[in-house]
Amino acid sequence: YSKFHVSLMKSWYGANATVENNWLYDHLPKLDIPNYDVLKMFDLMSQGKVNGYMCQGFNPIAALPDKNRVMGALAKLKWLVVMDPLATETSEFWHNVGPYNDVKSAEIQTEVIRLPTTCFAEEDGSLVNSSRWLQWHWKGADGPGEAQTDIRIMSELFLRLRKRYQAEGGKFPDPLLKLSWPYKIPDEPSPE
């Protein structure tokens, strides 16, 4: 895998990744256990070991087993960011709607931020799934209201974090500061 690793790190870090610094291998997070799958993450949330969660195009309350355990884990977070075109069970887990979601909203301290995204038909891009097919599609229409593409939201987040690290420093800013971002439109890179 050495050639793949070098190619990957050069694509992420450009000229900053060199043989002298081991292609910035130390910038990659290291696991203390063999696998952090989604069930393990929710277990860690339940234990209060995870402070925040970015949920992008995924509805864990509807997708994972034991809805009450998942909701309990989300309630222990300090913050939850949900990026989805629709309001989902996850983005509304804190909201009491009687028998459909009978929770004590006042006891849930998680700050929930919902960032409305466009759906697949409102952006250019590719689709891939477990059936092993890959399909390119072109944008069919603009997204509604303030909805933004996932690419724009994540790019804005990266650029703002990078700017803040440049101004204020931080514990280990290098992975963000040295990342290569050679796009013509930095805040909304084209998937082409």
Task: List each model region and its residues.
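Non-catalytic alpha/beta scaffold blocks inside enzyme catalytic domains
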Residues: Y1-P191
